[in-house]
Amino acid sequence: MKKIISLLALTIIFTAALAAQDATIYLWRNIKGMEKQPSVMFMHKPVEGSPNTRTAVIVCPGGSYHHLGLKSEGNSTATWFSQNGVTAFVLKYRSAESLYHHPAMLQDIQRAIQLVRENAEEWNIDPNKVGVIGFSAGGHLVTMAGEFWQTHDEIAKLGIPCSVSLRPDFTVPVYPVVTMQDDIAHRWSRNSLLGKGKKNQTQERKDEFSMELNVPADMPPTFVVVCDDDPVVIPENSLRLYAALQEKNITCHLAHYEWGGHGFGMKDCPFMDEFHWNEELHVWLKDLGFME
């Protein structure tokens, strides 16, 4: 009897897991020379009965560009968006843990944006309502997506035909890595992105990948989240980005909290119970026409 109950419990857990994730999309399937690349994104469709926003968001977990917090920052975020009528795609992008550095990560997020837009009709998505949200190093990645969609078109460099824009419609960097400058850079993320050593980390490259130095005039609307007590990424990263966005008159918002630390994502925790930062994001996205 105990064995039957255990098997039933496992079946329920497995079924719930399947229900939460609707499809696995391989980014580089059938792309010559890229077929063996492991990058995938996990699709979470809007929950039945939720608003028909036709908005999509690509979720980029953090992990210092070395590994990925798929569960803590990826799945919890995708669940919240899907409950609010947004199709979410958790991006498992390549990282230094598997010996990948730039441009692998940027290739992956640009390819993800391309695939979402190219399949928008099939997936009930408005191609003009495709945003990105990222945490920590993932915050740097989504900011790159917002800044580099023209200057660093990795899809074109690979010779892949693309008839859609690679510009996200909104960008949400959460406790993000922003700068590569020596004074406040998150060194692990910098090493993972650029590679170690002076040859890989020239001042020119540090400037190129410092997001606060490269905000374009057509940067997407950006919502930045930061906590003063962040023990991992120095909060000044977010403040520099926000100042740069304001200087360029970009539509932006700074969700600035006294405490909360780092790595909370959208999972249940004391910080979320106290501040509900995702509800502040909800209001902002609603005002822009991306949520209801």
Predicted regions and their residues:
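Short beta-strand/loop motif that positions the catalytic acidic residue
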Residues: 224-226, 230
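N-terminal cap/lid segment of alpha/beta-hydrolase-fold proteins
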Residues: 21-52
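Mobile cap/lid helix-loop segments that gate and shape the active-site cleft of serine hydrolases
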Residues: 30, 176, 180-214, 220
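Primarily recognizes the serine-hydrolase "nucleophile elbow" in alpha/beta-hydrolase
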Residues: 114-185, 206
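Active-site glycine-rich loops that stabilize anionic/oxyanionic intermediates
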Residues: 61-66, 228
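Short beta-strand element of the alpha/beta-hydrolase
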Residues: 53-62
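C-terminal catalytic histidine-bearing segment of alpha/beta-hydrolase fold enzymes
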Residues: 44, 225, 236-292
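Catalytic nucleophile-loop/oxyanion-hole region of alpha/beta-hydrolase
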Residues: 69-71, 76, 91-127, 270-275
